[in-house]
Every structure is written in C-alpha cells, then in structure tokens.
Amino acid sequence: MTRYLPLALLLPVAFASAPQQPQPRSRSAAIADRGLTPADFPKLQKIADRVYVFSDLHSGGFGYLTNDLIVVTDAGVLVADGQGTPAVTQKLVDEIRRLTPQPIVNVVVCSEHGDHTGGNVSFPSSAVFFSSPASQAALQAQAANDRPGGSRTIVPAETVASSRTIRLGTTEIDIVYNGRAHTSGDLEVSLPAEKILFASEVFTNHIFPSMRTAYPSEWIATLERVAAIDAAMIVPGHGFVEDPATMQAEFVAFRHAMGTVVAEGIRLHGLNLPASDAVAQARWGEYVRWTGSERNAPIAIQRVFDELDGKLK
C-alpha cells in the first residue's frame, strides 16, 4: 500500500553565485540509513493543492528513491517522469486513479534514462508524451533495438526545444529546457502559481553526482539557470522529498557538490594520469559520504577528463 506523508571558467562563477552552503549534516539518500525498508514504499506525498510526488525504490537496486511529479487538474493529469519498470509505473498509474477520476493526458519525459522511462508503456496509450529533441532521438534509437517480448520504448510525439506552456483547466504548467546536464536533453517542469519546480535528474538529493552520460561543466551552467527560476519547492529526480526549506538547502548543497567534483576532476587531469589511476588521489571532502560516491566518483572523473580532452559532443 502506498504511504502518504502530509569547467574551469565556470567554477568561480558557480561558487560565487551559489548561496552559502549550510553546515554539513548527517544526511543520506539511502532508505536504510533512515531506518526504512522496501516495505515502506511506494510513497505519495502531497506538496500543494492537487500536486503530489510519487516515490519508489530505484529500479537498479541502489537503495534510494526515484521521484515523479503528479499535477491534477479539472482538465486531466500531467505526470513528469515515470519509473523504471512497467510494474512500478503501473503502481503510479493506479495511485493517480485513486486520487482522481481525471485521465492522465500528458507525460513529460524529463530524463530519457531507463530508470525514468522503462515503465512508460504502463501509461494510457491516449497520453501525449513530451521530451526534448535530444531525448526523443535517444528514445527513437532505443526503440529501434527493442527486443521481442520485452518492454516497449515509448517515443514522445511532442518536443520542447526551449520552453512550452501547457494550460490544463486553470493550471499553468511550464516545461523548460535549461541546457545539458545529467543527459543531453534534460527538461524541468515548473508550476509558476504554486512556485514548485520538478528538476528531475538535474538535481538529486544527497547523491554523489552521477555523470555516466553527463556534460560536467554544462551541468553547472544549467544549475545556474535552474536556480534563477522562482520556486519555493524544488523536487529532485532521486532522493528524499522533504519540506521546502530543506529542499532549498539541499539544492544549494548539490550545486556545491557539482562545483567540487568538476574542480577536482580538473585538478586530477593536470596530474597527467589515466582517470582510473587519478581517482585514487581525489579529495572529495564531505562528498565521499554522499550516497553512491563509491560507484559514481570514478565515472565522474572519467567524464570530466573526457570533457577536457574534447571527447564530448
């Protein structure tokens, strides 16, 4: 049952413009570190009138949460991001049916990665899917390689290259592209009246930056633009969703983490060592205690090296 709960030139700019980072706290994105178990999920949280966040365990077994935004209106429901499997996404769909008789009319693919799109086949076939052009192309390529009998990849019919405003009844919803970050086509969803921003994988709560397909210095610039959006509540793509003040503080902390990781990658690149050797000399400070650091740190260093070497296109 669902549980309810009421690069080098950029770095000085990033650190200077980010608000002062709060003092380090004993926090974690891992559910086990908070005394929770898989039986405590999925979870639905109401964050504003007719606005909810659905959270369930990451489909990769990493022990932290994947989050989706649900916006209920008199003209239908908009969902931002899905879950990693058809079964878990069906739980999301079923939860929406318990919330409202209104149909799911729009699904926004903010992240093209499988942990957010792997279950999209469970959404109603009548729903209109949106993504960035880059994510649409990535999902088209993936769909071409779908295996018989496997889950079908849904390719969005609509694309958002810069921004698009959707009006469902009296609710205004902005879909925005602020630049490459965790992927080549990250989107964010903003509710201007409610001052809510769903940042998807551009922001993860207390998880060491995951850069497998990222654009490190561009991610820092994208975070700067996202920070300029007038939002009291910022919802991450992964990690716990807490009160607005805590989420603001965690967003600031994540921006500092990104700056630190990229700066350390630049320093290590200057040692003229292979990335696989350089990572052993990394100085992460408090971020070594962030969830996923052991897995994500070597990937981040390699990705920064690739960017500095001109290998990212």
Question: Where does each model-flagged region fall?
Answer:
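Hydrophobic h-region of N-terminal signal peptides that target proteins for export
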Residues: A8-A18
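N-terminal pre-domain segments of enzymes
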Residues: Q20-P42
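Metallo-beta-lactamase
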Residues: F41, K46-I47, S135-G179, T183-G185, ...
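Conserved beta-strand hairpin/beta-sheet module of binuclear metal-dependent hydrolase folds
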Residues: Q45-E95, L187-E201
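Active-site neighborhood of phospho(di)ester-bond hydrolases with catalytic His/Asp-centered motifs
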Residues: A80-G82, V105-H113, F130-P133, N178, ...
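Divalent-metal (often Zn2+) His-rich catalytic cores of metallo-beta-lactamase-fold enzymes
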Residues: S190, E218-L273, D277
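C-terminal regulatory/interaction regions
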Residues: G270-K313
